[in-house]
From Swiss-Prot:
Reaction(s) catalysed by this chain's protein: ATP + protein L-histidine = ADP + protein N-phospho-L-histidine
Annotated source species: Escherichia coli (strain K12)
Name used for this protein in its record: Sensor histidine kinase GlrK
Function: Member of the two-component regulatory system GlrR/GlrK that up-regulates transcription of the glmY sRNA when cells enter the stationary growth phase. Activates GlrR by phosphorylation.
Note: Not required for the regulation of the glmY-glmZ-glmS regulatory cascade by glucosamine-6-phosphate depletion.
């Protein structure tokens, strides 16, 4: 990630900057909407005010025109100089209102026509108690022009309302498009800052996954992003180095322990064998019993050491490569390897492989099957049955190892996969259990992207199930 001079160095600064930049377009939109709303409000108030003034003026001009005509006719009937003065006052008032109304009229010709009519009506001309013919014509023309003025005023007022509506619609459309653009800008910034924050978190997640899988992080790990996340990455790298060192120390300790234990154990085994062969002299029955106990204990100790070393070796192994494994040969090999103890206990084994293959590592899977089948033989009931079966369930293959015998107590089921745990039901045979077999088996299955667990099967005493990925050749 390229760092700019103003790039936030901490996660808090980055989050604050993200919030500010994402809110900025929304604040701009809100500010512009407020300004536009104020402008439209002022414009609407102005339109309403001018419309009211113009409408009242046009109404007043209409009334003034009627009063002028009434005063004109009254003067012709009464020939009263006072009425002449009233008429001229009304004419002057109409002229002033016409000048004020000139800006409202859409056509200057109408204004000039009214102005000319007012000029023509400046002198009162009467005949036979009424306006003469020319004056009557001028009064008629003035009334007609005044009516046209009122209609023109109404048209102008209506057009103002329509113009205001069009402007409101245009502003609404403008803000609609602007809102869409600003929303897209905000969305782009959300995605950008999400990537800037999630990217380093994903790197840390990958580092933790590699660490959990037992793979080395190496020295090529690059750290980017806020200082807090870079610090976490550095601590994870330090933790990886520390775990690697502890793992190497553990392996070294186990190698030394194995060497230090196997050497005296071999001498002990050799001594007990010499005593058992009576090389140093004949033994009494009591002495033979003691030698037998020593030999059995030394064998158990050797088996325990070998299982402990095997358990740690499998934990330290790198990730396995899965391949297509045919189940039938593995099962046949495992059953054959334990045929003698099974025959000695008169146990019957059924094999039912409906799923013929799975994805696994052959040696690890054989080791697990060998452990489970060996447990079924040695923990199973005399003259009992053992069943090895497989089935396909979606993208997973189930391999069940079932035997008759004493069921595992409910309170022990959660503990049987823990290292060194031995249940209340003891193993039958010359070699006693160490409590590591099932723990090693589960670790092996999990390294092959599978799972090993105990299930309840109707009509069966004990059933261990292996769950593994199915292969393309699985039927």
């Amino acid at each position: 990630m390229k760092r700019w001079p103003v790039f936030p160095r901490s996660l808090r600064q980055l989050v604050m900057l993200a919030f500010l930049l994402i809110l900025l377009p929304l604040l701009v939109l809100a500010w512009q909407a407020w300004q536009s709303l104020n402008a439209l409000s002022d414009q609407a108030a102005l339109v309403n005010r001018t419309t009211l003034i113009d409408a009242r003026r046009s109404e007043a001009m209409t009334n003034a025109a009627l009063e002028m005509e009434r005063s004109y006719r009254q003067y012709c009937v009464l020939d009263d100089p006072t009425l002449a003065k009233v008429y001229q006052s009304q004419r002057k008032r109409y002229s002033e209102m016409l000048d004020a109304h000139a800006g409202v009229l859409p056509d200057d010709k109408l204004y000039q026509a009214l102005r000319q009519d007012l000029h023509n009506l400046a002198q009162l001309q009467c005949n036979n108690s009424g306006p003469d013919a020319a004056a009557a014509a001028r009064l008629e023309a003035f009334a007609s022009a005044n009516t046209e003025m009122v209609q023109a005023t109404r048209t102008v007022v209506f057009s103002r309302g329509q113009q205001l509506q069009r402007e409101i619609a245009e502003r609404g459309q403008y803000f609609g498009w602007q809102s869409l653009v600003l929303f897209l800008v905000s969305l782009v910034m959300v995605l950008l800052f999400t990537r800037m924050i999630i990217g380093p978190v994903k790197n840390i997640e990958r580092m933790i996954n590699r660490l959990g899988e037992g793979r080395s992080l190496g020295n090529s790990v690059s750290f980017s992003g806020p200082s807090e996340l870079r610090s976490v990455g550095q601590r994870i790298l330090w933790l990886s180095e520390r775990l690697s060192w502890l793992e190497s120390q553990r392996h070294q300790f186990l190698r030394h322990l194995s060497h230090e234990l196997k050497t005296p154990l071999a001498s002990m085994r050799e001594g007990t064998e010499l005593l058992a062969d009576q090389v140093v002299g004949p033994l009494t029955p009591e002495q033979k019993e003691v030698v037998s106990i020593l030999d059995s204990s030394s064998r158990n100790l050797q088996k325990l050491i070998e299982q402990l070393l095997d358990y740690n070796r499998k934990q330290a192994d790198s990730a396995v490569e899965l391949e297509n494994v045919e189940l039938a040969p593995l099962v046949e090999t495992v059953v054959s390897a334990h045929s003698l103890p099974a025959r000695a206990k008169m146990m019957h084994t059924d094999v039912d492989l409906k799923a013929t293959a799975c994805l696994a590592e052959p040696m690890l899977l054989m080791s697990v099957l060998d452990n489970l089948y060996s447990n079924a033989v040695h923990y199973g009931a005399e003259s009992g049955n053992i069943c090895l079966r497989s089935s396909l369930h979606g993208a997973r293959v189930y391999i069940d190892v079932i035997n008759t015998g004493t069921p595992i107590p409910q309170e022990e089921r959660a503990m049987i996969f823990e290292p060194f745990f031995q249940g209340s039901h003891q193993r039958k045979g010359a070699v006693k259990g160490s409590g590591l077999g099932l723990s090693i088996a589960r670790d092996c299955i999990r390294r092959m992207q599978g799972e090993l667990y105990l299930v309840d099967e109707s009509g069966q005493d004990v059933c261990f199930r292996i769950e593994l990925p199915s292969s393309k050749n699985t039927k």
